[in-house]
UniProtKB/Swiss-Prot annotation:
Subunit structure: Interacts with IFT20. Interacts with IFT52. Interacts with IFT140. Interacts with CEP78; regulating IFT20 stability and localization.
Name of the protein this chain belongs to: Tetratricopeptide repeat protein 21A
UniProt keywords, alphabetically: Differentiation, Disease variant, Repeat, Spermatogenesis, TPR repeat
PANTHER family named in the record: STI2 PROTEIN-RELATED, TETRATRICOPEPTIDE REPEAT PROTEIN 21A
Annotated family: Belongs to the TTC21 family.
Function comment: Intraflagellar transport (IFT)-associated protein required for spermatogenesis. Required for sperm flagellar formation and intraflagellar transport.
Covalent S-S links between cysteines: none
One of the GO biological process terms: flagellated sperm motility
Length: 1320
C-alpha cells in the first residue's frame, strides 16, 4: 500500500499543495511501479491531470477508481469538481454524482473521509476539509495521518489564530514516528513563527531518515534564505541541482541570488551578466519541461525575476517571450496579460504595455490591475486628463474594496505631473509606502518577499519624492530634509535585501549626496562596480569630488566615465562639472573652451543609428553654464568678454527664477572692476524673502572682511541672517564667522543657541567642544563633553572627550572615559558597534603611552568587533563595505606598527599581510612591508614587493628610493645611485631623497658628486637656499667632508623646522661633542697625534659640551624612540665632561636604557663607550662583541660602524691585529668613505712594518677625510718616507702645510728629512 511509504505520500501531497501538478503525476507514476493498481496513487495521478485542465482524461481516470472504498468519496468529489470545469457542463452527470456522494457518506470509512478531507484542502475548501477530518477523528482516534492533515489545514489557513493551533495537531500526529509529512508541517510552522533554528532542526531530522526527499532540501534552502544566510542558500541550491538538475525551486533561488546579490547585469559582455542570463534561461527551461502545462505556476515562479531584473533588456526579453508563450497557451489568463503590461513598462515601451493592460481589461472588466496599468500608461505618455478621468472612476470603485497602494501612488504621480501641491503629493506618497510595507509584515526573506517588495515600485516612489528634495548637498548644521529621510527609509529595505540592484543604490547615493556627502562615495563605488558604464553614477561621483575640492579625482573620474561609456560626453552636466573643476584648479582657458563648446550643444538631437536621445540643456543648467563661463572669463582677466556674456545672460533670464542667482554672480564681476559700492548695493537689494538671500549676505560679509577689512560689518551680515532666517544653520554660520575672527567665546554662545534648536546634530555638539578647545578653555571643554553626554546619551562625544584628554596627557582620565563608554551590554546595531570600534582604537592609543601590554588585547577586541560589522554590512548596508574594509585594514596596520615598535618583526609582517585580505592592492602597505623586509634582511622579498609597486606606478617615488636602498644593500652601488638620480631629476627639491643620496654617495666613496645636486635644487626656486631641508643636507655634507663649523652653520638654519629640526639638533650635538669625528673612547692613536696645547683642547671640549647641553633644551621628543635618543645624548654630554661622577651617572642611565630596550644598538654603543672612559675595558669589549654579531641595517649603520671601530681600536691596543682587520674591512664594505677604518688599517700595516700597504691605506684615509685631518697627512708622508718615496712624501707635506699652516711638526720631522734624502 502507498500509505505505508511515508516519503512517497508526503512528496505527492507536498507537490499537490505547492501546485506542482506534473510533479504529482510523475511521483504517482513512480509509486504505481512499486504499488501497482494502488487506488490512492491513481487518484492523485488523475488529480494532477485534472489540474492541468485535461478534464476528460481526468474524468475517465477517476471513474475507474470511484468504486474503491478508500477513494470513493474523494473520487466522487473530484468528478463533480471536474464536470463543473467543463466547457459544456453535464448537469445530469453532476446530479447523479451528488446523489452518489450522499449515499457514500452514509457508510463511509475513516480512510475515505481522510482522502476526502485531503482533496477538499488541496482545492482550497479549508472549512469543509476540517469537517471531514474532524468526523474521521471521531470514528478513528488513532489515525495519526488525520492529525497531521488537520495540522496542515490549520497551518495554511488565512486566519492567524487558527495557524497557531496547527502545532498541537502536528505533534499529536507525529508522536514518536518519523512521519515525513508531519515533520514537514512542523518545520513550516516554525518557519511561519520565524523560529528558523527550530525549523532547521526538524528538517535535519527528515534528511537523516529520508536523504533523497527533495522537498525537505528545498525547505532547508528556503530556511537558509529566511535566515539571510546566502552562502548556505546557494550551496544548498547547487546540492539540490546535483540530485535533480532541473529543480524549479533551486533554479529560482539561484536566479534570485544572481540578480539580487551578485549584479553586474548591465554590461552585456560581462561574465556575471551571462551567468545571470543563464540562470534565468535555466529557470524557464525547468518550468517548461517539468511543468509544461501549468501557467499559474509559471507566473508564480517567474514573477520574482521581473521584480528584480530592473531594466536589463536581455533578461526582460527572455521573461517577456516566456510569459507571451504562457499567454498563447492560456489566452484567458488575465494575470499573465497584466504581467506583460508591467514588463513592457520596464522596457520603456508604454504603447505595448497599454495594449496588454487593455487585453487584461477585456478578460476581466472588473479587474483593478488592468485599469491601474492603463492609468499609469496614460500618465507616462502625458495624457493627464484621460488618466484623471479613469482615476476618479477607480477611486469610487475602490471605496468598497479598501485602500490600494498602487491607486494612491497613481494619485500622487498625477498630482506631481500636474504640478499641484507638494504637501498633498508627498502625503499620498507616504500613505502608499505605508500600505506597501504593511502588506509585507511577517514574510520571511525569499521569493515571495522580493515579489511583494517590488523594488521598481519603490524606486518610482523614491524618484517622485526626490523631485521635492533639496538639490544641493546639506550645509554643516543644516537639518536634513524630512523628505530625504523618508526616501532613505523607502530604499533601505531594497538596498539591504537586494544590494545588486543599481537603480535603488544610485538613488540612495543621491540621498546621501544631499544629506551625508561623506557617505555617498562608497555607495556610488558599489554602483560603478555593478555598472562601470553608468553615466549618472560617474557624474554624481564627479560632483562629490568637486564638492570636496578634490579636483584631481574629479578629472580622473570624468576620464574614467568616458572610458567606460563615451555617451557621458553627450551629457551637459559632464561639461559643466569639467569646467567647474578646471576653474577651481586655475586652468581658465580650458574651462572657457569647454563651456563655449557646451553652449553650442543642441537641446535635443537624435543620431542616426543610435537609440538614445542626447540629454537636453535645461534652462537652469544653461544659466549655470553661462555663469560658469562668466566666472572663467573673469578669472582669466577677460573682463570685457565676461561683461558681454553676463549682459546676454541677464537679458535671457530676466524675470525667470534664475534672475537672483545671476545678480549674485554679477557681483563678482563688478568687484573685479573695483566697484565695491556698486557690488554692495546690488546685494542689499536682495530681500530676505528671496531664495538667494543667504548667499547674498554671505557674499556681502566676505566683501566687508576681505576687501574693506571691517570685522564689525562682517559679523553684522551674519547677525542679520540669523534675525531674518532664524535656525540652526544660520546660527552655525554666525558661530563660524566669529571663530574665523578669533572670537571663540562669542562663537560658543551662538553655537550653544544652535545646539538647543537642533540637539541631535552631532556636528554641532562637536563644534561646541572644538570651540572650547580653540578658546583654550580645556576645563570647560571637558565639562561640556561630560554634560552633553549625560543629557543626550551621545556616545560619539566620548571619543571627542577621549581625544581631548589624551591631547592634554590626562591618560588615566581618558582611559576611564573610554572604558565607561564601552561598559554596556553587547550591542547588535551597526552604528553602536562602529562607535565601540572607534572607542577601542582610541583606548589602544591611550594604552601606548602607559600600558603597552594592553595595546594588543584592545586592538584584538576592535578587530573582532570590526569583523562582526563586516559580516553584517553586506546584508544590511552594502554601501559601507569599502569604508569598513578600510577601517579593518587600518586596525591591522596599527597591529603592525605596534609590533614594529616592539621589534617583533615576524608578527609585524603577518599584520601587514592581513591588510591585503581587506585591501588587496594597498600600495602604502606594500611599501611598509617592503621596508620591513629590508629591515629584516629579506632582500629578495623586499625587491619583489618594490617591483610590484613600480609595475603599478612606474614613478612611485618612495618605492624607487627603497629599491635604491636595496641595491645598496646588495652592493649594487651604481644601480642605487641611478635610481636616486632619476627621482631627483624629476624633483630636485625633494630633500629627503637628497639626504639619502648624500649618505649613499658617501658610502659609495663618491661624495664629490654631491655639489652638482645642490646646484640642481637651487634652479627650482630662488627660495631653495632658505629651505630647512636644503640647509640640513648642506650641513650633513659639510660634516662628512670634515668641515664641522660650516656644518653647524647650515644645520642651525634647519634647527627650528618641524620636519628637520630634531635631526638637525641631534647632529649638532654630535658635532659639538666630537668636532674632529674621532673614535669616541679610542686610544690607539692617543700618543701619536697628541696636541701640544692640552689646556686649549680641554677648554674647547668644555665649550662643546656646554653648547650641546643648550641645544638639547630645544630637543622636544614626540615619540618613545626620540625620548630614548634624548636620554642617550644627555648621557653622552655627561660622558664628554670626563668627570668621574658624571661618567658614572651616564653609565647608570645607559644601563637603564639597555635593559628597557634590549638589543638597542645606540644604547649598547653608549654603554661600551662609558665603560671605556671608566677604564672597564673587558665590560666594554663584551658589549661591543654583541654589536659585532648584529646584522647590518641602514637605520643603525652609523652606530654599528662606531662600535666596530671602537672594538678594532681595543684589539689594536692588545695587538690582536687579525681581529681588528676583520672589523675594519666590514666598515669599508658598508662605507667606502670610512677614513677611520683606512687609518686603523694603515696603523696596523705600519706596526707590521709593511710601509707600502700602510701607504695605500693612509692614502685612502687622506682622500676620504678630504684632507681635513693633518695627523692623517703626517702618517701618510711618514710612511712614504719609510718606503723611500721621497717625492710623494714632499708633495703630501706641502699639501698638509698649505691647508694646515699651523701644523709645523710635519716640516721638521718629515719634509726636511725627505728633501735631504733627495739631495745627492
Amino acid at each position: 500500500m502507498s500509505s505505508n511509504d511515508s516519503s512517497l505520500m508526503a512528496g505527492i501531497i507536498y507537490y499537490s499543495q505547492e501546485k506542482y501538478f506534473h510533479h504529482v503525476q510523475q511521483a504517482a507514476a513512480v509509486g504505481l511501479e512499486k504499488f501497482s493498481n494502488d487506488p490512492v496513487l491513481k487518484f492523485f495521478k488523475a488529480y494532477g491531470v485534472l489540474k492541468e485542465e485535461h478534464i476528460q482524461d481526468a474524468i475517465s481516470d477517476l471513474e475507474s477508481i470511484r468504486h474503491h472504498p478508500d477513494v470513493s468519496l474523494c473520487s466522487t468529489m473530484a468528478l463533480i469538481y471536474a464536470h463543473k470545469r467543463c466547457e459544456i457542463i453535464d448537469r445530469e452527470a453532476i446530479q447523479e454524482l451528488e446523489y452518489s456522494l450522499k449515499e457514500i457518506r452514509k457508510t463511509v470509512s475513516g480512510t475515505a473521509l481522510y482522502y476526502a478531507g485531503l482533496f477538499l484542502w488541496l482545492i482550497g475548501r479549508h472549512d469543509k476539509a476540517k469537517e471531514y477530518i474532524d468526523r474521521m477523528l471521531k470514528i478513528s482516534r488513532g489515525f495519526r495521518e488525520a492529525y497531521v492533515l488537520r495540522g496542515w489545514v490549520d497551518l495554511t489557513s488565512d486566519k492567524p489564530h487558527t495557524a497557531k493551533k496547527a502545532i498541537e495537531y502536528l505533534e499529536q500526529g507525529i508522536q514518536d514516528t518519523k512521519d515525513v509529512l508531519g515533520l514537514m508541517g512542523k518545520a513550516m510552522y516554525f518557519m511561519m513563527q520565524q523560529n528558523y533554528s527550530e525549523a532547521l532542526e526538524v528538517v535535519n531530522q527528515i534528511t537523516v531518515t529520508s536523504g533523497s526527499f527533495l522537498p525537505a532540501l528545498v525547505l532547508k534552502m528556503q530556511l537558509f534564505l529566511a535566515r539571510q544566510d546566502w552562502e548556505q542558500t546557494v550551496e544548498m541550491g547547487h546540492r539540490i541541482l546535483e540530485k535533480d538538475e532541473s529543480n524549479i525551486d533551486a533554479c529560482q533561488i539561484l536566479t534570485v541570488h544572481e540578480l539580487a546579490r551578485e549584479g553586474n547585469m548591465t554590461t552585456v559582455s560581462s561574465l556575471k551578466t551571462q551567468k545571470a542570463t543563464n540562470h534565468v534561461r535555466n529557470l524557464i527551461k525547468a518550468l517548461e519541461t517539468r511543468e509544461p502545462e501549468n501557467p499559474s505556476l509559471h507566473l508564480k515562479k517567474i514573477i520574482v525575476v521581473s521584480r528584480l531584473c530592473g531594466s536589463h533588456q536581455v533578461i526582460l526579453g527572455l521573461v517577456c517571450s516566456f510569459i507571451e508563450r504562457t499567454f498563447m497557451a492560456t489566452p484567458s489568463y488575465v494575470h499573465v496579460a497584466t504581467e506583460l503590461g508591467y514588463l513592457f513598462i520596464l522596457k520603456n515601451q508604454v504603447k505595448e504595455a497599454l495594449l496588454w493592460y487593455s487585453e487584461a481589461m477585456k478578460l476581466d472588466k472588473d479587474g483593478m490591475a488592468g485599469l491601474t496599468g492603463i492609468i499609469l500608461c496614460h500618465i507616462l505618455e502625458g495624457h493627464l486628463e484621460e488618466a484623471e478621468y479613469r482615476l476618479e472612476f477607480l477611486k469610487e470603485v475602490q471605496k468598497s474594496l479598501g485602500k490600494s497602494e498602487v491607486l494612491i501612488f497613481l494619485q500622487a504621480l498625477l498630482m506631481s505631473r500636474k504640478h499641484k501641491g507638494e504637501e498633498e503629493t508627498t502625503a499620498l506618497l507616504k500613505e502608499a509606502v505605508e500600505l506597501h510595507f504593511s502588506s509585507m509584515q511577517g514574510i520571511p526573506l525569499g521569493s515571495e518577499y522580493f515579489e511583494k517588495l517590488d523594488p521598481y515600485f519603490l524606486v518610482c516612489i523614491a524618484k517622485e519624492y526626490l523631485l521635492f528634495c533639496p538639490k544641493q548637498p546639506r550645509l554643516p548644521g543644516q537639518i536634513v530634509s524630512p523628505l530625504l529621510k523618508q526616501v532613505a527609509v523607502i530604499l533601505n529595505p531594497v538596498v539591504k535585501a537586494a544590494p545588486a540592484l543599481i537603480d535603488p543604490l544610485y538613488l540612495m547615493a543621491q540621498v546621501r549626496y544631499y544629506s551625508e556627502l561623506e557617505n555617498a562615495q562608497s555607495i556610488l563605488q558599489r554602483c560603478l562596480e555593478l555598472d562601470p558604464a553608468s553615466v549618472d553614477a560617474h557624474l554624481l561621483m564627479c560632483q562629490i569630488y568637486l564638492a570636496q575640492g578634490n579636483f584631481g579625482m574629479c578629472f580622473h573620474c570624468l576620464e574614467l566615465g568616458v572610458s567606460h561609456n563615451f555617451q557621458v560626453r553627450d551629457h551637459p552636466l559632464y561639461h559643466l562639472i569639467k569646467a567647474r573643476a578646471l576653474n577651481k584648479a586655475g586652468d581658465y582657458p580650458e574651462a572657457i573652451k569647454t563651456l563655449k563648446m557646451v553652449i553650442k550643444l543642441p537641446a535635443l538631437k537624435k543620431e542616426e543609428g543610435r537609440k538614445f536621445l542626447r540629454p537636453s540643456v535645461q534652462p537652469s543648467q544653461r544659466a549655470s553654464i553661462l555663469l560658469e563661463l562668466v566666472e572663467a572669463l573673469r578669472l582669466n582677466g577677460e573682463l570685457h568678454e565676461a561683461t558681454k556674456v553676463m549682459q546676454d545672460t541677464i537679458n535671457e533670464f530676466g524675470g525667470t527664477p534664475e534672475e537672483n542667482r545671476i545678480t549674485i554672480a554679477n557681483v563678482d564681476l563688478v568687484l573685479s572692476k573695483g566697484n565695491v559700492d556698486v557690488a554692495l548695493n546690488m546685494l542689499r537689494n536682495i530681500l530676505p524673502k528671496q531664495s538667494c538671500y543667504m548667499e547674498a549676505r554671505e557674499k556681502m560679509a566676505n566683501i566687508y572682511l576681505q576687501t574693506l577689512r571691517d570685522r564689525r560689518l562682517y559679523i553684522r551680515c551674519y547677525r542679520e541672517l540669523c534675525e531674518h532666517l532664524p535656525g540652526p544653520h544660520t546660527s552655525l554660520l554666525l558661530g563660524d564667522a566669529l571663530m574665523s575672527i578669533l572670537e571663540p567665546e562669542k562663537a560658543l554662545e551662538v553655537y550653544d543657541e544652535a545646539y538647543r534648536q537642533n540637539p541631535h546634530d552631532a556636528s554641532l555638539a562637536s563644534r561646541i567642544g572644538h570651540a572650547y578647545v580653540k578658546a583654550h578653555q580645556y576645563t570647560e571643554a571637558i565639562e561640556y563633553y561630560e554634560a552633553a553626554q549625560k543629557i543626550n546619551g551621545q556616545d560619539f562625544l566620548c571619543c571627542d572627550l577621549g581625544k581631548l584628554l589624551l591631547k592634554l596627557k590626562k591618560v588615566n582620565k581618558a582611559e576611564k572615559v573610554l572604558k565607561q563608554a564601552l561598559e554596556h551590554d553587547i550591542v547588535q546595531d551597526i552604528p553602536s558597534m562602529m562607535n565601540d570600534v572607534k572607542c577601542l582604537l582610541l583606548l589602544a592609543k591611550v594604552y601606548k603611552s602607559h600600558k603597552k601590554e594592553a595595546v594588543i588585547e584592545t586592538l584584538n577586541k576592535a578587530l573582532d568587533l570590526q569583523s562582526r560589522i563586516l559580516k553584517r554590512v553586506p546584508l544590511e548596508q552594502p554601501e559601507m563595505i569599502p569604508s569598513q574594509k578600510q577601517l579593518a585594514a587600518s586596525i591591522c596596520i596599527q597591529f603592525a606598527e605596534h609590533y614594529l615598535a616592539e621589534k617583533e618583526y615576524d608578527k609585524a609582517v603577518q599584520s601587514y599581510k592581513d591588510v591585503f585580505s581587506y585591501l588587496p592592492t594597498d600600495n602604502k602597505v606594500m611599501l611598509e612591508l617592503a621596508q620591513l623586509y629590508l629591515l629584516q634582511g629579506h632582500l629578495d622579498l623586499c625587491e619583489q614587493h618594490c617591483a610590484i609597486l613600480l609595475q603599478t606606478e612606474q614613478n612611485h617615488e618612495t618605492a624607487s628610493v627603497l629599491m635604491a636602498d636595496l641595491m645598496f644593500r646588495k652592493q649594487k652601488h651604481e644601480a642605487a645611485i641611478n635610481l636616486y638620480h632619476q627621482v631627483l631629476e624629476k624633483a630636485p627639491d625633494n630633500f629627503l631623497v637628497l639626504h639619502k643620496l648624500i649618505d649613499l654617495l658617501r658610502r659609495s666613496g663618491k661624495l664629490e658628486d654631491i655639489p652638482a645636486f645642490f646646484e640642481l635644487a637651487k634652479k627650482v626656486s630662488s627660495r631653495v637656499p632658505l629651505e630647512p631641508g636644503f640647509n640640513y643636507c648642506r650641513g650633513i655634507y659639510c660634516w662628512h667632508i670634515g668641515q664641522p663649523n660650516e656644518a653647524l652653520k647650515f644645520l642651525n638654519k634647519a634647527r627650528k623646522d618641524s620636519t628637520w629640526g630634531q635631526s638637525a639638533i641631534y647632529h649638532m650635538v654630535q658635532i659639538c661633542l666630537n668636532p674632529d669625528n674621532e673614535v669616541v673612547g679610542g686610544e690607539a692613536f692617543e700618543n701619536q697625534g697628541a696636541e701640544s696645547n692640552y689646556m686649549e683642547k680641554k677648554e674647547l671640549e668644555q665649550q662643546g659640551v656646554s653648547t650641546a647641553e643648550k641645544l638639547l633644551r630645544e630637543f622636544y621628543p614626540h615619540s618613545d624612540s626620540s625620548q630614548t635618543q634624548l636620554r642617550l645624548l644627555q648621557g653622552l654630554c655627561r660622558l664628554a665632561t670626563r668627570e668621574k661622577a658624571n661618567m658614572e651617572a651616564a653609565l647608570g642611565s645607559f644601563i637603564q636604557i639597555a635593559q628597557a630596550e634590549k638589543d638597542s644598538v645606540p644604547a649598547l654603543l653608549a654603554l661600551a663607550q662609558a665603560y671605556v672612559f671608566l677604564k672597564q675595558i673587558p665590560k666594554a669589549r663584551m658589549q661591543l662583541k654583541r654589536l659585532a654579531k648584529t646584522p647590518w641595517v641602514l637605520s643603525e649603520a652609523e652606530d654599528l660602524e662606531k662600535s666596530w671601530l671602537l672594538l678594532a681600536d681595543i684589539y689594536c691596543q692588545g695587538s690582536k691585529f687579525d681581529l681588528a682587520l676583520e672589523l675594519l674591512r666590514r666598515c669599508v664594505q658598508y662605507n667606502k668613505s670610512c677614513y677611520k677604518a683606512y687609518e686603523y688599517m694603515g696603523f696596523i700595516m705600519e706596526k707590521e712594518q709593511s710601509y707600502k700597504d700602510a701607504v695605500t691605506n693612509y692614502k685612502l684615509a687622506w682622500k676620504y677625510s678630504h684632507h681635513a685631518n693633518p695627523a692623517i697627512g703626517f702618517k701618510l708622508a711618514f710612511n712614504y718616507l719609510k718606503d723611500k718615496k721621497f717625492v710623494e712624501a714632499i708633495e703630501i707635506c706641502n699639501d698638509v702645510l698649505r691647508e694646515h699652516p699651523d701644523y709645523p711638526k710635519i716640516r721638521e720631522e718629515i719634509l726636511e728629512k725627505a728633501r735631504r734624502s733627495l739631495r745627492p
